[in-house]
């Protein structure tokens, strides 16, 4: 008969949330720049929009927006209001909603500080999620350099927020 005591229970494994806006923004930026430098402008442009979306959502989360179970922007507006959460959108509507519904951001002062580092964020006014379906000749190719500049500003903003300990 063995007198060994039972093994201690294993500590629960902590699984990080699936949604990681900052990491996604950086991944999309790396891929967008690779595509841009090889002349694949249509897909680079699409990814620059995703950089903007993910970077801005990372900032909003850092400024107090409560995450859903996956770690992302929740699907519903905070109580007592009802309906879809205004920050659960793509650019350019996301940028419009940040301005129009600014009161839902718990730390608006901090959000303003970092948004000021992205003066060209409204250059995504003609970016559409639906561009992914369009013919190359129908895309606003002339806007891609503007989107690139704004996406670079967003990654620089993320760098600053990270350096400041906000992200």
How should each PLM-predicted stretch be described?
Residues 1-167:
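Terminal alpha-helical segments
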């Amino acid at each position: 008969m063995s007198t060994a005591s039972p093994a201690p229970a294993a500590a629960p494994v902590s699984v990080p949330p699936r949604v990681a806006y900052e990491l996604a923004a950086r991944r999309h930026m790396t891929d967008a720049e690779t595509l841009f430098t090889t002349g694949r402008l249509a897909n680079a442009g699409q990814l620059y929009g995703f950089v903007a979306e993910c970077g801005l959502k990372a900032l909003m989360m850092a400024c107090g927006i409560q995450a859903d179970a996956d770690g992302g922007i929740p699907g519903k507006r905070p109580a007592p209001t009802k309906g879809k959460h205004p920050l659960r959108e793509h650019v350019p509507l996301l940028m419009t909603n940040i301005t129009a519904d600014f009161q839902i951001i718990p730390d608006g002062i901090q959000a303003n500080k970092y948004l000021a580092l992205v003066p060209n964020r409204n250059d995504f006014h003609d970016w559409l999620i639906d561009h992914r379906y369009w013919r190359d000749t129908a895309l606003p190719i002339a806007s891609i350099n503007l989107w690139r500049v704004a996406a670079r500003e967003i990654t620089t903003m993320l760098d600053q927020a990270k350096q400041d300990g906000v992200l």
